[in-house]
From Swiss-Prot:
GO MF assignments: asparaginyl-tRNA synthase (glutamine-hydrolyzing) activity; ATP binding; glutaminyl-tRNA synthase (glutamine-hydrolyzing) activity
InterPro entries, per the entry: Asp/Glu-ADT_sf_sub_c, GatC
Documented EC number(s): 6.3.5.-
Protein name, as recorded: Aspartyl/glutamyl-tRNA(Asn/Gln) amidotransferase subunit C
Organism annotation: Symbiobacterium thermophilum (strain DSM 24528 / JCM 14929 / IAM 14863 / T)
Keyword field: ATP-binding, Ligase, Nucleotide-binding, Protein biosynthesis
Domain of life per record: Bacteria
Pfam families assigned: GatC (PF02686)
Length: 96
């Protein structure tokens, strides 16, 4: 199924784009090459290819969720220019 110049012009009108004749030709050629490539992909025999969710096999991408020691809250807050109610206090940047 080839993309025609009329289809390019119709889509351009719907998108409110003004295309030159040269751009229409270029887009038609590019879209037709893309569609040819998709057609070649569709013809591939993938009957023996198992379905996958990811292109690369991932082996245990997540570590075990176990608690680890963290920084002391008071020591971290001592580094803050300002702190209030156990939290960093930052300048207001929005109005309202």
């Amino acid at each position: 199924m080839a993309v025609t110049r009329d289809e390019i012009q119709r889509v351009a009108r719907l998108a409110r784009l003004s295309l030159s004749e040269e751009e229409i030709e270029t887009f038609a050629e590019q879209l037709n090459r893309i569609l040819e490539h998709v057609e070649r992909i569709n013809r591939l025999d993938v009957a023996d290819v198992p379905p996958t969710y990811h292109g690369v096999a991932l082996q245990h991408p997540f570590r075990e969720d176990k608690p680890l020691p963290s920084l002391d809250r008071e020591a971290v807050l001592a580094l803050a220019p300002e702190a209030e109610a156990g939290c960093y206090k930052v300048p207001k940047i929005t109005e309202g």
